[in-house]
Structures are given as structure tokens and as C-alpha cells.
Amino acid sequence: MSTFEKEPSSPDPKFYVAGVDVGQKQDHSAVAVVDKIDRRFALIHLKQFQLGTEYGSVIGYLKLLNENLHDLRRIMIDQTGVGETFMSMAINSGLKNARGIELSQPKKQDVMTFLKHCMEDGLVHIPYDREFMNELNVERFELLETGRLKFSHPPGTHDDRLWAFALAIYYARLEPTEYHPVAAVNTRPSPGNLFPQLPRSIWKR
């Protein structure tokens, strides 16, 4: 899912949103693009950069997305920590549809909870990707004394693509839609895991 082609012209406008999770030495930078159709979200593009990839290369990739993907309405960037520098570079580079979001603990809970509910309601469609499926399955949460959830992943794993995907869906929710009910899946997750044992029905081959 790391390649894309120029989208052919279409009379029907699309609603594409990209999510960007910024990393560098210990974490990967990642980009996810979703297509919003009614109340459903389809993952159409997913890219994980190598560790240590320069921010300029990631921004160049986003500019290429803008040029080749019509109707990319918004690029949502996690500007927490190192993301602040990246966000400034993105704006200075001319990415006019880029916006930053501070992922505080409450906001992280909002973003990830929304994704979880969408997946439980069968509103999310993802091309089959074993590594990304594992990334979803191992994400953990812990209830803090404050009543908030803390998210983490086991040592040796990453959740960069997951957060990029979650950010894209979180912004795409703002587009007005018509409701079309679909089957619900995995409505009772096991304690401690956010998306345990995801059914194969959400993965497109």
C-alpha cells in the first residue's frame, strides 16, 4: 500500500483525508489516506517511512500526494513534540491543506475511541495487510486514575501507521453524510487490547 497512481478525472467529487504521524530515529513517520463515502471510511493508501527519514522527504511525499490525488481535502498532522517543527516546515513548503493537531491525552482518547467505534460498527474497510493488522491487534490501553485512557504498544512494535490512520478518520468524520447501516463487528474487545482479534471481514483482498 505504499505506492499510488494519479487519480483519473471523475465528475463526482471525493472526500479524501490524509493523516500524518511524525517520527524520526525511534519511531517511523507514517501517512494514511482515507476515502469518506457516506458514513464509511476506506483506507486507500498507507505509507511507512524508514527510521531516520528526513522531514523534507516526508513533506515532498505529501506534496506528491497533493499533486496526484484529486480532492485531498485535508492533511492532518500530529504536531505533538517533534511534530511542531514538521508542521512549520509543511506550512512553509506551501501545503495549504495541512493542519496540525495536538494529541493531548484527552484528544488521543477521542481519536482512538472514535476509530474503535467505527470499526465495531463495520464502517471501516482496509485492504489486507498482515503487518498493519498486527499493528492494530497489539495496541494496548490502560485506564488511569484520572479516568483517561493511556495508549501504548509492546516493545519491539510500532503504532505509527495506526495513529496516522486514526487521525485521517477523525477529521473525515466532519463531512456531512447520509446514514446507511452496515453490520457491526467485534463489539466486545478483550480488556487491555484496543482492537483484539479483528475479523477478516474488514480486510479487502
Predicted regions and their residues:
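Short, surface-exposed amphipathic charged segments that create phosphate/polyanion-binding patches used
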Residues: 111-121
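RNase H-like, metal-dependent nuclease domains and their acidic two-metal-ion catalytic environment used
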Residues: 1-105, 109, 113, 126-205
